[in-house]
From Swiss-Prot:
Lineage of the organism: Bacteria, Pseudomonadati, Pseudomonadota, Gammaproteobacteria, Enterobacterales
Location in the cell: Cytoplasm
Species per Swiss-Prot/TrEMBL record: Salmonella paratyphi A (strain AKU_12601)
EC top class, as a word: transferase
Catalytic activity: 3-deoxy-alpha-D-manno-oct-2-ulosonate + CTP = CMP-3-deoxy-beta-D-manno-octulosonate + diphosphate
One of the record's GO molecular function terms: 3-deoxy-manno-octulosonate cytidylyltransferase activity
Annotated metabolic or biological route of this protein: Nucleotide-sugar biosynthesis; CMP-3-deoxy-D-manno-octulosonate biosynthesis; CMP-3-deoxy-D-manno-octulosonate from 3-deoxy-D-manno-octulosonate and CTP: step 1/1; Bacterial outer membrane biogenesis; lipopolysaccharide biosynthesis
Official protein name in the record: 3-deoxy-manno-octulosonate cytidylyltransferase
Gene field: kdsB
EC number, UniProt record: 2.7.7.38
Function as written in the Swiss-Prot or TrEMBL entry: Activates KDO (a required 8-carbon sugar) for incorporation into bacterial lipopolysaccharide in Gram-negative bacteria.
Length: 248
């Protein structure tokens, strides 16, 4: 099947300045992400960035770049600018791969594209089971609850669903109901155009989760269990050191 990967790569990260260009075992991080995307079989891969140094690193690795504005409030807004500049048709399948995921398995990039293509829905994503209490109660691990057809009912930083009887006895173990959302999305290009036309929702401001805008406006997001679990993403300097060690 045909799909396009867009990799947003913002230079000015608040916790790790110049994050796309940090060195991981001899290559900029953004080049590692580009290589994982190439392994997915995508028809086209575009790095969307607001910084010339990132663009030069990508082009030196043979990648395609789309220069975007620096004032976007979200990664989806950056995607929308690329969609318009490239003139993608409304039914084009777009996969948003985060620029700080150098260990993302190529198989899940393709999985989210295929899941979207098989359904009459504008957006799809992935999740993995949560097995540890530490992760279940960590607000940085976003949880998702699904309906019977695999569509998201809600995303939250809180522990959902709350296993009342189990947690009344102990907070040391979790059951099989908790799923951690992975930050990879598939969209149809026309859906991205609609998304950025909507006003931000109160829930997304409360949780700081932009995907809640979709549910707020009554749209569906399909969620499948990922075929592989991504490695560590890079948000902090400590994450960077872990990734360097894991990728040696």
């Amino acid at each position: 099947m045909s799909f396009v990967v867009i990799i947003p790569a913002r230079f000015s990260s608040t916790r790790l300045l110049g994050k796309p260009l940090v060195d991981i075992n001899g290559k900029p991080m953004i080049v590692h992400v580009l290589e994982r995307a190439r392994e997915s079989g995508a028809e086209r891969i575009i790095v969307a960035t607001d910084h010339e140094d990132v663009a030069r690193a990508v082009e030196a690795a043979g990648g395609e770049v789309c220069m975007t504005r620096a004032d976007h409030q979200s990664g989806t807004e950056r995607l929308a600018e690329v969609v318009e500049k490239c003139g993608f048709s409304d039914d084009t399948v777009i996969v948003n791969v985060q620029g700080d995921e150098p260990m993302i398995p190529a198989v899940i990039i393709r999985q989210v594209a295929e899941n979207l293509a098989q359904r009459q829905v504008g957006m799809a994503t992935l999740a993995v089971p949560i097995h540890s209490a530490e992760e279940a109660f960590n607000p940085n691990a976003v949880k998702v609850v699904l309906d019977a057809e695999g569509y998201a009912l809600y995303f939250s930083r809180a522990t959902i669903p709350w296993d009342r009887d189990r947690f009344a006895k102990s907070l040391e173990t979790v059951g099989d109901a908790c799923l951690r959302h992975l930050g990879i999305y598939g969209y149809r290009a026309g859906f991205i155009r609609r998304y950025v036309s909507w006003q931000p929702s109160p829930l997304e401001h409360i949780e700081m989760l932009e995907q809640l805008r979709v549910l707020w406006y009554g749209e569906k997001i399909h969620v499948a269990v990922a075929k592989a679990v991504p490695g560590t993403g890079v948000d902090t300097a400590d994450d960077l050191e872990r990734v360097r060690a894991e990728m040696r």
